[in-house]
Amino acid sequence: MSFPIWFISTACTQLGIALIYAFTWQVFREKATWAKVLVVTGVGFMAAGLVGMVHALVTAPPSADSALVTRGPIFIGMVGYAGCFLWTALEGFHHHRMALRRLALGLTDPIVANRFFLWGLFGLMASSLTAISAVTALLGGRPSGTPITMLPMGVLGAAAATAMYLAFFSPAWYVGWLQSQAPKDSLGGSKDRARPRSARPQVSCVHASRAFM
């Protein structure tokens, strides 16, 4: 891969993860000072890793193994990646647990409650995938260089993508299944099942999460 293409792809990846940091902060901990510090710290680790990788590649001799000369900076950047996904998992599962309590009392929508779980599941799968990549890089290997790493990373990536799809683009069959599992007196229960999906009140993840805090 050419250096410009590598740099652009890595920068875009880091931008995407920075936006996930921002999303988790704004949705779950908008007013928490520690959350702002966490976002800045995580983005700082990613930026430091990128700068370190660029420096290592530019100054390394042509015959050097890129995986070896960049393993330190890659690991630093992966710390920022892992912080984002682990925080995402913790917030998702924490608010899912709180949502289940409200769901039992008929105070929330089963679809919203499930989205918290899916968001947490995405974070857990992505955290595990990042951990594999970080350890492999630290040992001087390439995550894509062996089936031992590619197979679990592929499974984890597919699980993370599925969780994101179900959370943000829930198909009708999945929504119906969630409603069938919900307590009868909850939002989305028997009363909502009699109404067309388009006529049901839409509860945003942002508003729901704030109500649970």
Model regions and ranges:
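Membrane-helix interface motif
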Residues: 51-63, 135-139
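Intrinsic-disorder/low-complexity, polar/charged segments
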Residues: 1, 30, 61, 109-110, ...
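Juxtamembrane/interface segments of multi-pass membrane proteins
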Residues: 1, 58-73, 102-110
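Histidine (H) residue identity feature
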Residues: 55, 94-96, 207
